[in-house]
A protein has these predicted regions:
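Extended beta-strand/beta-hairpin segments
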Residues: 1-58, 62-64
Length: 64
């Protein structure tokens, strides 16, 4: 059985000074703030694409 999941991100501004929000559409678990600074420096309560991929990989690995 195939499972389809979706999320989307809305970004405002340029790469370094801008910010965005990633929404987990399928689960409805929430909307998370993302910034370049949080991705490359201190997280300061924000997530990053790498953290979201790590969470997905970790949960898939444990179900294998």
């Amino acid at each position: 059985m195939a499972a389809t999941r979706s999320a989307h991100t809305v970004w405002n501004g340029d790469l370094f000074a801008g910010s965005g929000q990633t929404t987990l559409d399928s689960s409805g678990l929430g909307t998370f703030d993302v910034t370049w600074k949080a991705r490359t420096e201190a997280a300061e309560g924000k997530t990053s694409p790498e953290e979201l991929i790590a969470a997905a990989h970790s949960s898939c690995f444990n179900m294998a």
